[in-house]
């Protein structure tokens, strides 16, 4: 057998949220991947249906129309924008460009699993900082950093805990990290947050040359199937990442549909309103049943159980009823489960089954 890179052997394969079995004839109730339950508006659907693309032609490699739209809406210079096949690809590109066997990639203990995978894939040294009350601990992150720390990944809000860092905490983190460390703020769930002391950090990033802010169309925009993420970066970082970014990495349909969705302000507003209502509803229902729910600002909740066994038994029992939620063993949270804010029908079905198992 041909041996792989040693760092690759350290990587635990990423396991996505379960989607059900192809053997089952009934449609699964999938609450495991934080997908949007909100349907596109008729106007957006009509625009999409009128989109006719020549499949024999490669897509625009620079996503120029979409880049222009994002530049206008978010008030950022188009030279600072880069696109990825999902945010994941951007995390890999950053790791490949800025890490090696002598340099560290830093992240919070219960941060998104792709961070350590990307760091290891780039032969970097993985370092994580302990959290406090399921929230990234700024002092611990700063303490764990040193002059070999080149990248710090931080999800804000965090997946899978749903907790967030305030504007002042992000600034404290940036000021406490080494000057040569790139702070990468993953704001995949930022649009769901309504807390006044929160920011997606774009405004702050524009004042500095050492911050990257990533965003995605997979969550509130409901485009998970088309894989599209983007990042605001210092111009030099964009130029560096483009050296190894795969050509034509964003398909033509993803580019066109994203442009249409960015114009649909009502869709975005409806998604936020829906999420706030049903997240509160689900949290209250689980609290009423005696479960501890960690306060979340995202489109999911994390439920903490008395033991890992209790959490696993509930998830396994729900699977038998074709309901899928997220076990968090790989996140070092084996006594917790993550549940997406799905459709009203799916959430009520989930609650009925949980009550039966009480």
Which sequence ranges carry the predicted segments?
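Active-site pre-lysine segment of PLP-dependent enzymes
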Residues: 120, 138-147, 160-183, 187-220
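PLP-dependent aminotransferase class I/II
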Residues: 62, 210-287, 291-294
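PLP-dependent enzyme catalytic core of the Aspartate aminotransferase-like
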Residues: 168, 175, 309, 317-321, ...
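Phosphate-binding glycine-rich loop
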Residues: 65-104
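Conserved PLP-binding catalytic core of the aspartate aminotransferase-like
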Residues: 276, 288-321, 337, 341
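PLP-dependent aminotransferase-like
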Residues: 97-154
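N-terminal "arm"/small-domain region of PLP-dependent enzymes with the aminotransferase-like
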Residues: 1-57
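Short acidic capping loops at alpha-helix termini that bridge into adjacent secondary structure
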Residues: 77-81, 101-104, 148, 180, ...
